[in-house]
């Protein structure tokens, strides 16, 4: 274990009442990501009275940042740090929530719950290049234009969704590619940036600690290229879902594939890739 590891803890918010789906990260006086509003009781229970000074959000997707506004009501002293491109949506979340409700329909409330506005005076926009309590901030677009990653002085990197989804060690690593602003070229550059840091461990939201970052980062880069090749082939939604289900379930473990598909709905993955192809495919180097 490296210096400072004893101050770093994954916080399981038990999304959809199941463990091992969404992790926040407790590090010194900071909470990195907080999960959706629906998991707020689990988050507070897991924190067991501990109160951070700062909430630092890797990006504003609901599974990472949904509870942020509710936490500012719970903890009046809490300051929230987020990419500049996402800050205004947290101050005035009505359009963001309405858009998500159109996508998820009747599932929205069960999956995420509503957003509470964050007072602008408690929002701190980030551009990348800042250092916050030993956490070096980097602008890392690709999964989202408003995504940041953090390299801690301990050697840990907290990477949100840039390093993809891998629910348990030894399982496949794959890229969550929901609409609207997937950019595979930018994403690969962000993965390369994190790899250049040579982190000792990764803290990923879905899910937990990656003890050996180098092969994991290579695996997410490989999956991004595979996804680009798939969508360029003209594959349809149903065939894409079938291919990914086989990959995630190891060709037979359908229940495990379903766990991944609940965490990242495969139909939305397809829609995000299709949008990327239409917007960036002609200019992409992938």
Regions found by a protein language model. Name each.
Residues 213-222:
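Histidine/acidic-residue-rich catalytic or RNA/ligand-binding cores of hydrolases
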Residues 47-51, 130-133, 196-198:
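Glycine-rich phosphate-binding loop signature in dinucleotide/nucleotide-binding domains
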Residues 3, 90-138, 145-214:
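Metallo-beta-lactamase
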Residues 32-35, 53-60, 81-83, 139-142, ...:
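Active-site neighborhood of phospho(di)ester-bond hydrolases with catalytic His/Asp-centered motifs
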Residues 40-85:
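Active-site metal-binding motif and surrounding structural segment of the metallo-beta-lactamase
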Residues 1-50, 150-159:
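Conserved beta-strand hairpin/beta-sheet module of binuclear metal-dependent hydrolase folds
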Residues 230-286:
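C-terminal regulatory/interaction regions
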